């Protein structure tokens, strides 16, 4: 990328990382409110059975995440990072809105959980496709001496999403009764992400394209050494995501298994997310100097 295209403004940088953060926020809200969502869409089971069905529905989103990465990643290499990010973010907004508006099991019966599974599949596909182009955009937009810092912002905003989701959950659990949370409170938490989607799309439409080569350019096959490095990088990233999934499950375990008040379990998530927001950029900054 030319030197002038490296001069990414703060609003443009915020548009990339904020979009990623918003997508993780809504993805995680579903897990944070799994107990309440289970009561809405799987009411015919006991509390444990309802929770397990909800967690299974949550897990469905992870099935399509690799597919989203495999499809959108190469597509972004050909048509550009910006179109790929716009498509993924629009699809994410559509799937979130679908989840918010899906009627309960009491209203439309078995169609309700079927719709939830469908929207979760779309949500997972969009999130899986978003991460690659957004991370590549940050790498291509950064100068060599700031590349680690720029890319670390991608992961810092994921932690910010956990922090924000925890704060929203803490606020709603303090203001609403358990029944209100199950009836409509979780929809409010998820709808907050939908409200920001139009503004984020506008910001992303104004982003410069960072992909230099033309779509018809042939891509060389990666060498064996490059594939080995990529393999170990994937393992490292997979290990790092364990912390994110632990924080996602922390609220469910605390409320359902330990019997802790929801506000306390959300508070633990807030603390963990705050640490991630602070230390991810520090790690990126250090990597630029090693």
Residue ranges, per PLM feature:
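Helix-to-loop junctions at the C-terminal end of transmembrane segments
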Residues: 67-81, 280-290
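C-terminal ends and interior cores of transmembrane alpha-helices
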Residues: 43, 90-109
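Glycine-rich segments within core transmembrane alpha-helices of 12-TM secondary carriers
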Residues: 126, 148-173, 196
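Extracytoplasmic gate region of multi-pass secondary transporters
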Residues: 30-31, 226-276
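Extracellular/periplasmic helix-loop-helix junction of adjacent transmembrane segments
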Residues: 34-67, 85
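C-terminal membrane-cytosol helix-exit motif in multi-pass small-molecule transporters
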Residues: 170-174, 194-212
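Hydrophobic core of transmembrane alpha-helices in multi-pass small-molecule transporters
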Residues: 108-128
């Amino acid at each position: 990328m030319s030197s002038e295209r490296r001069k990414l403004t703060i609003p443009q940088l915020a548009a990339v990382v904020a979009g990623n953060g918003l997508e993780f926020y809504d993805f995680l809200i579903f897990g944070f409110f799994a107990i309440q969502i289970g009561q809405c869409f799987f009411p015919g089971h006991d509390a444990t059975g309802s929770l397990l069905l909800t967690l299974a529905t949550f897990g469905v989103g992870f099935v399509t995440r690799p597919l989203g990465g495999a499809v959108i990643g190469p597509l972004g290499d050909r048509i550009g990072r910006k179109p790929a990010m716009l498509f993924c973010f629009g699809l994410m907004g559509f799937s979130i809105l679908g989840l918010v508006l899906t009627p309960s099991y009491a209203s439309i019966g078995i169609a309700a959980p079927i719709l939830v599974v469908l929207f979760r599949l779309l949500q997972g596909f969009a999130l899986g496709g978003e991460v690659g182009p957004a991370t590549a955009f940050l790498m291509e937009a950064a100068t060599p001496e700031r590349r680690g810092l720029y890319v670390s912002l991608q992961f810092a905003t994921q932690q910010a999403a956990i922090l924000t989701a925890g704060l929203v959950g803490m606020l709603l659990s303090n203001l609403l009764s358990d029944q209100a949370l199950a009836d409509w409170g979780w929809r409010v938490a998820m709808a907050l992400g939908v409200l920001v989607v139009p503004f984020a799309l506008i910001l992303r439409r104004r982003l410069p394209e960072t992909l230099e080569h033309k779509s018809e350019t042939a891509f060389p096959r990666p060498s064996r050494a490059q594939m080995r490095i990529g393999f170990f990088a994937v393992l490292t990233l997979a290990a790092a995501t364990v912390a994110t999934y632990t924080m996602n499950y922390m609220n469910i375990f605390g409320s359902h298994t330990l019997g802790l008040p929801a506000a306390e379990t959300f508070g633990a998530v807030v603390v963990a997310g705050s640490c991630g927001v602070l230390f991810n950029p520090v790690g990126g900054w250090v990597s630029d100097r090693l």
